[in-house]
Amino acid sequence: MAQIIDGRGLAEKLQKKLAEKTARLKEKTGQVPGLVVIVVGNNPASQIYVRNKERSALAAGFRSKVERLPEETSQEELLSLIETYNQNPDWHGILVQLPLPEHIDDEAVLLAIDPDKDVDGFHPLNMGKLWSGHPVMIPATPAGIMAMFHEYGIELEGKRAVVIGRSNIVGKPMAQLLLAKNATVTLTHSRTHNLAKTAKRADILVVAIGRGHFVTKNFVKEGAVVIDVGMNRDENGKLIGDVKFDEVAEIASLITPVPGGVGPMTITMLMEQTYQAFKRSLES
């Protein structure tokens, strides 16, 4: 039976350390990190995520602000607000909650955020730095997974890693971070031929395909480490991952649960990157 990776417990531990670091810097400088979250419309899931981010920022000792904009906000109005925060030195991190309403171009919005304040790590400049081996802002979910590997002493060098899912938010940056640790990485997706066969070769399997219970024990080698990034709802409204947890846990060596695995770490890494952006602003 697999050991369960306690993402919630690890996130709380790192959050406590972050609050201590913030308090020390405040004592030295009289300043704290500032994080603004911008949300457009009333998507219920977005509202939950935003509340969690706000709660986490306040727990870390940050100054936190949420800009709640109506659904009909124009793209120009949103870009203008982002530029206001770009120019304000009191705010070190800017998060725009996705998804945005259909009339707003996500890419234009992500491009508008100052790369130095892009704590989501989605700006093309930050993506380029990651791929060139000089990361500054890293997408928070892959960053959280790497922190899990470190905390649990999971060796990556020389290991075969398979990532299922090729999004810019998780799959691609995850593959690059694993490569940087000298893993041999295969990046797969829903159209990969013989996907289960490919996945079954993995020592490290990261699943971010967005399909509930997509990965069964037929995808998993005995003793593999399995990271489930999925967040889906079943027919009863229960939150489930991309991995069929009960059967995969019988053969994996370590596995993340859903909920309580990757999710809490994602928010903690957003806070860590806000802190780092604040530190860089003090040094510049």
UniProtKB/Swiss-Prot annotation:
Q: What's any one GO cellular component for it?
A: cytosol
> Known PANTHER family for this protein?
C-1-TETRAHYDROFOLATE SYNTHASE, CYTOPLASMIC, C-1-TETRAHYDROFOLATE SYNTHASE, CYTOPLASMIC-RELATED
SUPFAM superfamilies with a match to the protein in the record:
Aminoacid dehydrogenase-like, N-terminal domain, NAD(P)-binding Rossmann-fold domains
Is Transcription among this UniProt entry's keywords? no
> What gene makes this protein?
folD
Protein's name according to its UniProt entry: Bifunctional protein FolD
List ligand-binding residues for NADP(+): 165-167, 190
- Could you tell me the keywords of this UniProt record? Amino-acid biosynthesis, Histidine biosynthesis, Hydrolase, Methionine biosynthesis, Multifunctional enzyme, NADP, One-carbon metabolism, Oxidoreductase, Purine biosynthesis
Q: Which domain of life is it from?
A: Bacteria
State the family it belongs to.
Belongs to the tetrahydrofolate dehydrogenase/cyclohydrolase family.
- List GO molecular-function terms, semicolon-separated: methenyltetrahydrofolate cyclohydrolase activity; methylenetetrahydrofolate dehydrogenase (NADP+) activity
Which Pfam family, giving just one, matches this sequence?
Answer: THF_DHG_CYH_C
State the species of origin.
Answer: Streptococcus sanguinis (strain SK36)
Job description of the protein: Catalyzes the oxidation of 5,10-methylenetetrahydrofolate to 5,10-methenyltetrahydrofolate and then the hydrolysis of 5,10-methenyltetrahydrofolate to 10-formyltetrahydrofolate.
The chemistry this enzyme catalyses reads: (6R)-5,10-methylene-5,6,7,8-tetrahydrofolate + NADP(+) = (6R)-5,10-methenyltetrahydrofolate + NADPH; (6R)-5,10-methenyltetrahydrofolate + H2O = (6R)-10-formyltetrahydrofolate + H(+)
